[in-house]
Amino acid sequence: MTKQIQVDLGERSYPIYIGQSLMSDGETLSRYLLKKRILIVTNETVAPLYLKQIQDTMASFGEVTSVILPDGEQFKDLTHLDSIFTALLQRNYGRDSVLVALGGGVIGDMTGFAAACYQRGVDFIQIPTTLLSQVDSSVGGKTAVNHPLGKNMIGAFYQPQIVIIDTECLQTLPAREFAAGMAEVIKYGIMWDAEFFQWLENNVQALKSLDTQALVYAISRCCEIKADVVSQDETEQGVRALLNLGHTFGHAIEAEMGYGNWLHGEAVAAGTVLAAQTAKSMGLIDESIVRRIVQLFHAFDLPVTAPESMDFDSFIKHMRRDKKVLGGQIRLVLPTAIGRADVFSQVPESTLEQVICCA
């Protein structure tokens, strides 16, 4: 059974399809690809698994070619973005082009940003193959590449035409990548939906064993929340900032440790625990809530402490470059209960230092 969710953004609205064997479903894709020139962007890990399958599905719609990039967050940069532009220009692709992101969050972010920039904007489609990209980065139109001084600092808001989530891709996903995706799944429960958080607590083994029904429910619920938030606040002027729970600390970990050494979801897990500990220090939540958050991350084999090599100074230098900083003030998304969060703009650095040093 295929589930459909709509992201309501007026003229830029688009559907999300969630189910099995969707990469072979030419009927769903046909309206977006007919008489188009198609460039599939993927990586060296995904290409041997799924590239031929998706090429065969799309071959009847128009000219299909591909570009295969290295796999990893450390390659999400301007140099490898240029490889996509070169592939388009060498083939004389015009505004009738459609870019297809076949891969995880790195591929989706880069392909979307390339689509936003190429000839001032061409269509693109998201086909996310990792749990993290299925529940988070493929939905909402955030596209970007990293800079050595900060994560996702060069980018644009640019919405896809459609998101195709084929749950069968998760059967080939390494366990570490699956766990990293669960960090974002858990995040939705903490910041938005207490019932969903409790459901996750009760369904750890079903999810870890890749039970299809459990996966479809978890992915669908995350996409419903993301679609709701994005429909209210496309460009992150308000409520969408709550989706960054754990990310200010997490991005600091990724940048300090070197992109690719910690997976994004791993950094988000540790960052969310730091956010919860900060909230406890400020009297926003009690120890029992912190304990539930830590236990659920731990159940999915995720890190719940920051790297030992990182001290307060190494965190704060990156946190001051965070995109949410306003007027020089670090703004943090902190949980105020299971199922609720808020943005706080005046968190004392002394509190942050105490939390980081004691973590």
From Swiss-Prot:
Intracellular or extracellular location(s): Cytoplasm
Names of the cofactor(s): Co(2+); Zn(2+); NAD(+)
Tagged with keyword Nucleotide-binding: yes
Q: In which pathway does it act?
A: Metabolic intermediate biosynthesis; chorismate biosynthesis; chorismate from D-erythrose 4-phosphate and phosphoenolpyruvate: step 2/7
Q: Which residues bind NAD(+)?
A: 71-76, 105-109, 129-130, 142, 151, 169-172
Q: Which PANTHER family match?
A: 3-DEHYDROQUINATE SYNTHASE (PTHR43622), 3-DEHYDROQUINATE SYNTHASE, CHLOROPLASTIC (PTHR43622:SF7)
General function of this protein: Catalyzes the conversion of 3-deoxy-D-arabino-heptulosonate 7-phosphate (DAHP) to dehydroquinate (DHQ).
This chain belongs to the protein called 3-dehydroquinate synthase
Q: Please tell me the species this chain comes from.
A: Shewanella sp. (strain ANA-3)
Q: What is the primary gene name for this protein? A: aroB
